């Protein structure tokens, strides 16, 4: 069934603490705001929530008539319209409203920055989560489970016995490593020692190095090998902390009803703190003063004044540059992905070296157990940073793992990053969503933007064990 949140949200947002309204009952455009946010993607909604909590007067507009922007979840009819034009979906796929298909398929690290942000802002009370069944890696033509326990590690065919002993010594070093306690560093300075040099001290073979970098540290490519090892060690620690958090088969969690719930949760937060929302606002043209600083936004002939503008790249196309493309396949299936222990939610990482690519490919699958499809249906995604224009052949290694599919859709979108100087023009533009299957890069961008906008940093070192609100639903 469709999420209860999606029906209530527009009503809540318009009812809660909205500013003065004009004769048509619309929020007044002729007001001055501290910040106008354009686009209701996840990044923009987190920011409008955080800024509203800070006491800033926020107006949030979107040219679409739905929340989520590029990071929305579509029902079956919307999915069909986007990829197949006017055709109606076949009846055997079930009810349209039972589908919530993510446009940016990502899982959440259970101990990661997005979960910490949700707890910090108390948005957890608007959402329900469930652990993800399994995390797998593609190696030598086969799918292997990424070990989640010592016993699984001992039995795993990913490494031979002697290699397992060497790897265990390395894992113990990582587990004990505390940046603030030099006694745990064993005389190594991980801010200068590269990842390659650190791993070499343990004599691990290339396949293990590949596994550590891509399946545990979740790097997208191999640049990390020549960069300081501290980042990789922190990423490995995040993986193991996330894994330990729910004693599940993976370090990931995922919201019931899909990722479209996340922007809506933060939109509710903003509304509770006095933020104003306007959807279906065509054009949304940013206005600049004589000094080139953003000073307002015009839509339908009315201008709302502001001190700062926050937006996604599509609202200020002359201030961003293209940095790549994401290739993606979306499959509707009637079975779990083969060779994944019948998992109803799963991630498979295909490291670049296994495919002869320059960056990893990701397979992501969820199903009716997370309320994103009717009973018996599974939604699978294959995504990668595009390295060619032939999307079907490029994604073939991932699609081949899926088994028979009921429907298959292909999509490619450009990725952009800002090139402006925010302190000169007061425009704060988010970076497009990448191909990774988790939200760490997403939230890093948001927190950096928050600091640029406010000059403050958010302390996310919350005690997660105290976050009972988040735990109840697991």
Positions of the model-derived regions?
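C-terminal catalytic lobe of FAD-dependent flavoproteins
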Residues: 378, 388-474
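Short amphipathic alpha-helical segments embedded in low-complexity Lys/Glu-rich regions
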Residues: 64-69, 73-78, 132-137, 213-218, ...
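Short polybasic linear motifs
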Residues: 16
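Mid-domain catalytic core of redox enzymes
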Residues: 253-255, 264-268, 272-275, 281-408, ...
């Amino acid at each position: 069934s469709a999420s209860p949140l999606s029906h209530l949200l527009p009503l809540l947002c318009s009812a809660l603490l909205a500013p003065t309204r004009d004769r048509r009952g619309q929020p007044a455009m002729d007001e001055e705001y501290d910040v106008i946010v354009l686009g209701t993607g996840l990044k923009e909604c987190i920011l409008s929530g955080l800024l509203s909590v800070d006491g800033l007067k926020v107006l949030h507009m979107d040219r679409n008539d739905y929340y989520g922007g590029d990071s929305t979840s579509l029902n079956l009819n919307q999915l069909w319209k986007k990829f197949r034009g006017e055709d109606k979906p076949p009846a055997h796929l079930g009810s349209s409203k039972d589908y919530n298909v993510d446009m940016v398929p990502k899982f959440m690290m259970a101990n990661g920055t997005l979960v910490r942000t949700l707890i910090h802002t108390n948005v957890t009370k608007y959402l329900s989560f469930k652990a993800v069944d399994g995390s797998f890696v593609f190696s030598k033509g086969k799918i292997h489970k990424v070990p989640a326990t010592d016993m699984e590690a001992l039995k795993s065919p990913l490494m031979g016995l002697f290699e397992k002993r060497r790897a265990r010594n390395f894992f113990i070093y990582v587990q004990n490593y505390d940046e603030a306690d030099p006694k745990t560093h064993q005389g190594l300075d991980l801010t200068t020692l590269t990842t390659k040099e650190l791993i070499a001290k343990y004599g691990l073979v290339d396949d293990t190095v590949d596994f550590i970098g891509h399946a545990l540290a979740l790097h997208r490519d191999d640049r990390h090998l020549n960069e300081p090892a501290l980042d990789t060690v922190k990423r490995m620690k995040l993986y193991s902390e996330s894994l330990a958090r729910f004693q599940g088969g993976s370090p990931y969690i995922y919201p019931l009803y899909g990722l479209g719930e996340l922007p809506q949760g933060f939109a509710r937060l903003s509304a509770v703190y006095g933020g104003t929302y306007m959807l279906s606002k065509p054009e949304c043209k940013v206005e600049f003063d004589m000094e080139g600083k953003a000073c307002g936004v015009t839509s339908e002939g009315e201008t709302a004044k502001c001190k700062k503008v926050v937006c996604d790249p599509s609202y200020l196309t002359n201030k961003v540059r293209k940095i790549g493309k994401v290739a993606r396949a979306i499959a509707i299936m009637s079975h779990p992905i083969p060779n994944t222990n019948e998992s109803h939610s799963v991630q498979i990482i295909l490291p670049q070296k296994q495919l002869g690519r320059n960056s990893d490919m990701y397979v992501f699958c969820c199903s009716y157990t997370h309320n994103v499809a009717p009973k018996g249906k599974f939604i699978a995604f294959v995504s990668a940073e595009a390295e060619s224009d032939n999307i079907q052949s490029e994604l073939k290694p991932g699609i081949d793992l899926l088994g028979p599919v009921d429907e298959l859709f292909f999509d490619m979108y450009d990725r952009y990053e800002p090139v402006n100087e925010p302190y000169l023009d007061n425009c704060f533009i988010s970076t497009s969503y990448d191909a990774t299957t988790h939200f760490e890069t997403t939230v890093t961008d948001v927190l950096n933007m928050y600091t640029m906008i406010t000059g403050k940093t958010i302390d996310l070192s919350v005690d997660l064990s105290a976050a009972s609100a988040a735990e109840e639903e697991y």
